[in-house]
């Protein structure tokens, strides 16, 4: 079973093995989070994968059209305790890329654990339609006022009630 987790990747080294559309899309997603991404693929850097490429990486994505190579990358990473995702091969993944929605301060991630990524995208899109712009704005306001709310309502339960009341109209 996978544990849902949001991970800080700012400045962290990440490796993408493969140069096709899926690999490059996931490399961009990692870069968008501030990761230092290295892409290894003949069509990108003029050489193929070498075992040493995984050394020192925070996480690795194997996204080639060669399942044996993806499996080799996954095995190397597992042996070194490096989180790895082998695209379209859940058995060789220690993490998955969820379907992600970002609106203001809100981030929603939905995963089927690799069973059916299309279903995860459908749920993400449905949730996106439910998150009205004014709801997202109110969440942003509460976030900006969080320190003041902590001072005004030192009891966590009281603070929770204030936030719930501010957001109640979107939950009815």
Annotate each predicted stretch with a short phrase.
Residues 114-172:
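An accessory alpha-helical subdomain
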Residues 59-64, 70-97:
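ADP-ribose/adenylate-binding Rossmann-like module
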Residues 40-55:
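Glycine-rich, highly charged phosphate/nucleotide-binding loops
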Residues 58-64, 95-115:
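Short basic, glycine-rich beta-strand/loop surfaces that mediate nucleic-acid
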Residues 42, 88-92, 113-114:
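Short, ordered loop/turn segments at secondary-structure junctions
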Residues 1-43:
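Hydrophobic, well-ordered beta-alpha structural blocks that scaffold small-molecule cofactor pockets
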Residues 21-22, 68, 114:
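Residue-level detector of alpha-helix initiation sites
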């Amino acid at each position: 079973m996978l544990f849902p987790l949001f991970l800080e990747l700012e400045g962290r080294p990440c490796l993408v093995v493969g140069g096709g559309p899926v690999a490059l899309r996931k490399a961009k997603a990692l870069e968008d989070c501030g990761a230092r991404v290295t892409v290894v693929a003949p069509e990108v850097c003029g050489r193929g994968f070498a075992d040493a490429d995984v050394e020192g990486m925070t996480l690795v994505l194997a996204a080639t059209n060669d399942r044996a190579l993806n499996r080799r990358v996954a095995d190397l990473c597992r042996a070194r305790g490096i989180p790895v995702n082998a695209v379209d091969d859940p058995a060789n993944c220690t993490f998955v890329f969820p379907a992600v929605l970002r609106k203001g301060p809100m981030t929603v991630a939905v995963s089927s654990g690799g069973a059916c990524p299309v279903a995860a995208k459908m749920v993400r899109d449905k949730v996106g339609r439910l998150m009205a712009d004014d709801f997202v704005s109110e969440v942003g306001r509460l976030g900006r006022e969080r320190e003041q709310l902590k001072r005004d309502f030192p009891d966590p339960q009281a603070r929770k009630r204030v936030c719930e009341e501010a957001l109640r109209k979107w939950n009815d």
